[in-house]
Amino acid sequence: MQLIIVTGLSGGGKSIAIRQLEDSGFYCIDNLPAEFLLPIAENLEKNGTRAAAVAIDARSHATFENAFTALEALSQRGIDVRILFLTASNEELLRRFSETRRRHPLSTLAEHQGRELTLNEAIAREREIMAPVTETAHVLDTTRLLPSQLRRWVQQFVKQPAAKLTLTFESFGYKRGLPYASDLVFDVRCLPNPYYSPELRPLTGLDAPVASCLLYTSDAAD
């Protein structure tokens, strides 16, 4: 089984990475408490899961040491374990939190100590907590990456082929309304209607004579 552990700084892009891994066929778990890593990985392997990814953040720092020690046990069982650590500059993290207007996860935890940390303090504290993880992880700085670029990078990281594009063509009548799930609608009422040709009326668009009637007209060529 292939197991990717996605971790890093809040605002670094973990959610984007997890969504891309899910699109690439991975069984994904977001915000997993670190102490559950070993039992869940063992359960997934037992159930025949071939590729899984879990996201763990700094809120599990109290159990980090035991959890990441368990990775050795997973490797000994033949599980291909890799850690992806996503980071960014302080300025970029501040910008991202400002855009989303979300609170830093360590800010809320700090309330139990009688004072809430500022965003700058929370980022600094998180860097301190997560520093040991970077020693064994593949570190990616996402400061200058667009979300689309990060998704492509993650796809290459796990060596998954690009998702296949699925096209569904559907004919419809305007009097019955547009198909609600359409992404693109083409008005082809300017083309000749084979229905009004007696020899073509019994046929469908899958028949070659109908296709020829439509494709080789001057309007279709334009």
Which functions belong to the PLM regions below?
Residues V6:
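Hydrophobic anchor at the beta1->P-loop junction of P-loop NTPases
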Residues L9:
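P-loop (Walker A) phosphate-binding loop of NTP-binding proteins
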Residues G13:
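Conserved glycine(s) of the Walker
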Residues D23-D30:
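Post-Walker A helix-loop "phosphate-sensing" segment adjacent to the P-loop in P-loop NTPases
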Residues D30-N31, L38-E72:
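Conserved nucleotide-sensing/catalytic segment adjacent to the nucleotide-binding pocket
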Residues I79-F97, D183-P192:
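Conserved phosphate-donor/acceptor-positioning beta-strand/loop module used by diverse small-molecule
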Residues F85-G177:
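Phosphate/Mg2+-binding loops and adjacent switch elements
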